[in-house]
Amino acid sequence: MTKNIRKVSNIRYASIREMDISNGEGVGVALFVQGCPFNPHCYNCFNPDTWDFNSGKEWTPEIKDKFLELIDRPYIKRVSILGGEPLASENLDGVLDLVTEINKRYNFQKVDSANPCKIRVSEDKNTDKIRLLSSHKNIWLYTGYKLIIDYSESKRQRKTVFTLLPYANTNVVNDINEYRMLCENDDKRRMIAESVDFIVDGRYIDSQRDISLKWRGSSNQRVISVQESLKQGKVITLE
């Protein structure tokens, strides 16, 4: 008789902050994934220990369960995923799996059986609306990628599409092969981006550091309301 073994995507993590008040609005839990593909790394990066993909600790099914238990506490209103780089190709499967699970459990959404990566709001008419409001866990994603919105409208189609670029200005790219590598798996990257509540985008730029800013380190970074941006077809920021 063989024993069923649960598996999670092969990512690693640097640390878990059980009570986080700095990486998003309200009290939350923060996951710092391991590995950052950007070269060179951000000058004076806050988390240089997260650069190496082979460092950190293994993200096992047991660790994932413990992380979800931390989220389950009623006073936790937010989950933040940082790094490292959560949208690095090496981290996409694990981050997508976690975001999907959080939405299923806490945001009263369910996975579309025709497309396991696409999340849609549950149509259950018996849902307790009071509990719905109190149980929602906002998902914040911090990424060095720059969010671009493509919007098209016609008689038959009204569509908002997220594109995530590894550099805000492609003129700074020295190695085209490196740029292509950073753009691999864009579909998964887009799925993650469209499934969270807020994205803090852009690489940290030390010369634009501003300690007066909320939830980010430099003025080039933006706090984007994802779902509102999808509705309006343009980038909507909190500030």
Model-found features: residue ranges?
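Flexible loop residues that form catalytic
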Residues: 50, 84, 204
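Conserved glycine-rich "GG(E/T)P / GGGxP" loop and the immediately following alpha-helix
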Residues: 75-102, 211, 220
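Short, small-residue-enriched loops and turns at beta-alpha junctions
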Residues: 52-53, 85-90, 174
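Canonical Radical SAM [4Fe-4S] cluster-binding loop centered on the CxxxCxxC motif
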Residues: 9-11, 21-61
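Glycine-rich, highly charged phosphate/nucleotide-binding loops
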Residues: 58-72
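Charged helix-capping and loop-helix junction motifs
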Residues: 60-64, 93-99, 182-187
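Short, conserved beta-strand segments within well-ordered enzyme catalytic domains
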Residues: 30-32, 44, 78-80, 140, ...
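Auxiliary Fe-S-binding modules of radical SAM enzymes
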Residues: 3-24, 72-74, 103-239
